[in-house]
């Protein structure tokens, strides 16, 4: 994570100053970090090995971060330690894992297969742990998976075809997904971190085993299908993996997966179904970020997301979904470059 220059408004914010004083941090210099798609902000306490997290707009996400950070640590994984938290102001003082995200490491030429293997092993550790799902988080169930597809219906579909009735499209679209998504939930349920990708993973070189993989941005965790986080990692909307790496890492996971997962064919089937759903949802999310939230930067990734969506639909054998998209949204397959330019 790169830091920005100290912000005077942050330094003088009485709410922040009061919170830090209660944590024994009265003279810290705060360095704001770049934001992401959420309203959450992070500020590094220069030279302290600690970071201030601020998220007053999402009490559920704030509480989720605090509880899941402790839970993941108890499971033997590396999540930031929470030194203090105030739900009323949405402020938390947390451990600073430093700057070496996977994204930074990969940009510097670090061995890609080694980093991804470490992340896969961290997922395997999580999925084998009998207490992984023993935490109070929402269920990632059929209703939720279908509801997420409505983002595509209400943002992507009318962008491509302004005359479309989003509600009618959504009803038919979701009906086509209901049976395959039911199948995607047929495996064992575990803790799903949901945004398990290179921007949210750190290499903690001073730690051993799977604890070398630092976990970030897990506050939206749910209980659901194990393969979902594998999709997040290996079918990243933001970057292409080197040729053959996705398959190699999928095979690495399958070789050591819990017996309850049902073997290679069952895991692979769920992996492709969840990938198709995820990319379809993200195509809608990126347009919503642009049109509703004024964040056009994510449109840059749309061509890749639509390619991944096509591959996922084909791999999952969702022929009826493909036919419906071809009929109702002609040209959707090649819409990525034009939509990317809109930002």
Language-model features, listed with the residues they occupy:
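Conserved NTP-binding catalytic cores of kinases and kinase-like/nucleotidyltransferase enzymes
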Residues: 1-91, 190, 204-213, 326-343
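An alpha-helical support segment within catalytic cores of ATP-dependent transferases
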Residues: 12, 16, 21, 131-139, ...
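ATP-binding pocket architecture of kinase catalytic cores
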Residues: 38-147, 151, 157-162, 185-186
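Active-site acidic catalytic loop and adjacent metal/ATP-binding pocket
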Residues: 39-46, 52, 126, 177-228, ...
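Secondary-structure capping and boundary motifs in well-ordered enzyme cores
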Residues: 144, 193, 219-223, 271-276
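Active-site activation/catalytic loop segments of kinase-like enzymes and analogous catalytic loops
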Residues: 150-159, 226-261, 276-293, 305-313
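Acidic, serine/threonine- and proline-rich low-complexity regulatory regions
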Residues: 260-272
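ATP/Mg2+ or Mg2+-diphosphate-binding catalytic cores
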Residues: 284-343
């Amino acid at each position: 994570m790169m830091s920005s220059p100290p912000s005077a408004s942050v330094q003088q914010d009485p709410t922040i100053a009061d919170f830090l004083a209660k944590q024994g941090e009265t003279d810290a210099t705060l360095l704001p970090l770049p934001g992401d798609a959420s309203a959450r902000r992070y500020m590094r306490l220069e030279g302290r090995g600690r970071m201030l997290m601020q998220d007053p707009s999402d009490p559920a996400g704030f509480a989720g971060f605090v509880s899941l950070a402790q839970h993941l640590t108890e499971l033997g994984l590396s999540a930031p330690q929470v030194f203090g938290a105030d739900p009323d102001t949405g402020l938390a003082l947390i451990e600073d894992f430093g700057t070496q995200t996977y994204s930074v490491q990969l940009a510097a030429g670090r061995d890609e297969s080694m980093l991804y293997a470490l992340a896969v092993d961290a997922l395997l550790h999580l999925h084998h742990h009998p207490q992984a799902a023993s935490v109070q988080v929402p269920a990632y169930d059929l209703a939720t998976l279908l509801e997420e597809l409505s983002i595509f219906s209400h943002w992507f579909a009318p962008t491509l075809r302004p005359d479309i009735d989003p509600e009618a499209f959504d009803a038919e679209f979701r009906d086509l997904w209901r049976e395959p998504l039911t199948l995607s939930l047929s495996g064992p349920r575990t803790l799903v971190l949901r945004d398990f990708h290179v921007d949210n993973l750190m290499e903690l070189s001073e730690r051993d085993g799977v604890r070398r993989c630092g976990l970030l941005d897990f506050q939206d965790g749910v209980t659901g299908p194990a393969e979902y986080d594998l999709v997040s990692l290996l079918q990243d909307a933001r970057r292409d993996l080197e040729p053959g790496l996705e398959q190699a890492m999928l095979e690495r996971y399958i070789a050591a997966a819990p017996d309850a997962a049902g073997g290679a064919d069952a895991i692979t089937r769920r992996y492709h179904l969840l990938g198709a759903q995820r990319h379809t949802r993200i195509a809608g999310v990126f347009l919503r970020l642009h049109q509703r939230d004024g964040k056009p930067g994510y449109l840059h990734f749309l061509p890749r997301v639509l390619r991944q969506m096509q591959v996922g639909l084909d791999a999952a054998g969702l022929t009826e979904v493909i036919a419906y998209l071809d009929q109702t949204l002609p040209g959707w397959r090649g819409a990525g470059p034009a939509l990317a330019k809109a930002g």
